[in-house]
Structure formats: structure tokens, C-alpha cells
Amino acid sequence: MKLNIIVCVKSVVIGAPEGRVVRSSEFCELNPYDRPALEIALNLREAYGGAVTTVSMGPESSEIALIETMALGVDRSILLCDSALAGSDTLATATALGAAIKKLTPFDLVLFGIRTADSDTGQVGPQTAILLNLPSVTWVYSIEPAKNKFFVERRADGFREKFALPLPALVTVHPASIQPRDVGLHGIQSAFAARKVEFWNLKELGLSPEQVGEPGSPTQVISLKRVKKVRKCKFLTGSTEEQAQDLARLFVDTGFVG
């Protein structure tokens, strides 16, 4: 049973100057939450055969993250790169990724990380599943292929849940599900020397500018700022009754209770 697997990944910002989102290559890396999804895909290919394709959306600097996936051993990498995609929110991003996935039909499985380290929404995977009308499960720990379906396990609220998903399907992978492999130096050298990442523009996706970018985004980011947490610790002393009275008074004074 050979599997055609697509893994959607993102190049995320790290170590950028304070208060700025800089997407140049020196400040970007492969989203760490995508690494477990990629590892599961590679393990499935090694066990059952088939191919793994990584897809990302972003500026040209995002090519570096895709080259890293090629160094890990994926068969094909595609970057959705077009100026019209700038300013896309999660829905517009899902629209572009969904168009790319459709173009890669037939496929058996689409994998996402549960979220990205920069925007941290966790929305793009489920939105893509809805747009493609694919059965989907989030926070998946394990995937077991069977005839015309996948058995997946997720963990939530202290429970283990098992689902049977018909092919094709889309899942988001829990970061604790598996330990990602290291990138070997030889793989890095070969991937950067080859630079086989494909670039697809909006025309190749069959989309119009109105469907993506700011025109296709029902939400907009108004501002970005770092939130500084201020913690204060207050110790209650005295007898148990006195502490209870002080705690009740504190709840009222802070507006926690009326």
C-alpha cells in the first residue's frame, strides 16, 4: 500500500529585532511544530512506500525551510510564492494551500503541525480540511494505515480517542507524538546544492487576487506587541479562618467576585 503524503509546513520568524516581523532567511527556520508531522510522513513512506511532498506559502526566503525538508528526505517541495499572497490571514492561507493540494491530486494523507511558532492560531489545518471537504482529526499521536482508511489516535482531556478516517484525510499532529530525526550534514549539503524547490504562483494555483492576500482575508492584524507579564505574590497568614476571610476580601477587592 503505497502512500502519497502531503505535509504543509511554514517558515517561522526567530530572533527578529524587537517589535518587528522580519521574514528574511537569517531570521527564519522551519516551524518546529511541523517537524513531528514531517517525521510521521517519512516513517510512513519508509514502512509502506510512496512519496512525501512538502508545501509551504511565503516569500522567497521561505525556500530555506523547504530545503531543510529536502535534506530530511522528502521527495518534492513546493513553495507558493506570489506578491498577491502577502497579508493573507488563516482562511486565505488555507485557500492557497487547498488549491495546491488539489493540484497534487491524487493523495492519501495531508499532515499539518498543530500550530505555528509565530502566529500560534492552529486554524489553517482545520480550515484547509473544510475547504477540501476532507475528514479531519486534530492533535493526532499515531497513524496506522489500513485498507482504504487510516486509524488515528488523539489525546485530549486525559482521554485517548481512536478514529477511522476514510482516504484521503487530513490530520494535525501533536508535537509530543514522535521525536523528529536530526538533519545530517551530507543531506544539508546535497539539498542546498540541488535547490530543487518548485515555485508556484497564483496563476498556477488557479486563484484570483481577490481570493487571497488582504482582499481574501476576512480578518486583519491591527498591531503586534509583546505582552509583559507582571506577577505579584501575596502570602496569607494567620489562622485558617483569618486566611479564609482575607482571601474572600481579596476576591471582592480585585473584582474576581461581586
Describe the residue ranges of each PLM region.
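N-terminal glycine-rich FAD/FM-binding segment characteristic of electron-transfer flavoproteins
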Residues: M1-G258
